[in-house]
Amino acid sequence: MDARLLEILVCPICKGPLHYDRAAQELICNADKLAYPVRDGIPVMLVDEARQTVEGTPVDPSGR
């Protein structure tokens, strides 16, 4: 994921920051507990495509 792109992308719901999970190929919004898929290097920022992250499991913001 291009670092410059990640700097400008925000959660479409809360407009908060996203964290890239390289292993899962997802952009994570910790505030809304949603994960947006990254397909073929392209972030899919549609709410209907997002999945709920596991409640109580913090996502590592470093993407590790």
Swiss-Prot record:
Highest taxon of source: Bacteria
Any one GO CC term of the record: cytosol
Pfam families to which the protein is assigned, alphabetical: Trm112p
HAMAP family with a match to the protein in the record: UPF0434 (MF_01187)
Family indicated by similarity: Belongs to the UPF0434 family.
Protein name: UPF0434 protein Bmul_0750/BMULJ_02510
Originating species: Burkholderia multivorans (strain ATCC 17616 / 249)
Lineage, uppermost ranks: Bacteria, Pseudomonadati, Pseudomonadota, Betaproteobacteria, Burkholderiales
